[in-house]
């Protein structure tokens, strides 16, 4: 299944992501990534690579290295370079046998590393972007909205994942600030 990911060698992957791989100047202000490059970054699951490594390092008790990996990911691919997606929020899906599979996103990884401020900053930015996206979709004529139902569903799914993160990590103040006041919804 594409949902079940194999084991990783943290030392090798850390060395490759932090020292070997070169991503060019993609994070610099004067560089624009075209649609195909952004799509490729999504296909290779750029943020997921870093997040998975950080989560494994955290399991090994290497918190500082995990934080370094997350910071490197966000340094290379801030939202202005690579728009936030499900690899920021995390993914929780049902399995065929009635179970659940969960892949942490970078926000959850930051929370688990104790970097609440960074997690909240990314979450807040992503929430605001998704909210604007939903407003844009809702302003469309119904006929047009039906042609982008997948995008609407994805945005709504990610908003719900963000709400769950806020609730799970007891970020009541940020929930209120963002206008999410119902913890039991």
Set out the residue ranges of the language-model regions.
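C-terminal luminal/periplasmic domains and tails of membrane-associated envelope-modifying transferases
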Residues: 1-185
């Amino acid at each position: 299944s594409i949902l079940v990911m194999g084991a990783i060698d943290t030392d090798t992957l850390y060395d490759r992501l932090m020292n070997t791989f070169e991503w060019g100047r993609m994070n610099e202000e004067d560089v624009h990534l075209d649609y195909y490059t952004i799509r490729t970054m999504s296909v290779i699951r750029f943020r997921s690579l870093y997040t998975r490594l950080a989560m494994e390092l955290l399991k090994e008790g290497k918190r500082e290295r995990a934080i370094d990996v997350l910071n490197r990911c966000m340094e290379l691919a801030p939202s202005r370079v690579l728009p936030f997606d499900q690899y920021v929020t995390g993914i929780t899906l049902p399995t065929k046998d009635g179970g659940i599979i969960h892949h942490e996103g970078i926000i959850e990884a930051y929370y688990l590393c104790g970097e609440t401020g960074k997690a909240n900053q990314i979450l807040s930015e992503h929430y605001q972007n998704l909210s604007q996206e939903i407003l844009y979709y809702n302003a469309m004529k119904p006929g047009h909205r039906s042609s982008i139902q997948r995008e609407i569903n994805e945005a709504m799914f990610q908003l719900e994942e963000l709400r769950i993160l806020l609730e799970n990590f007891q970020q009541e103040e940020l929930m209120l600030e963002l206008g999410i006041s119902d913890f039991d919804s």
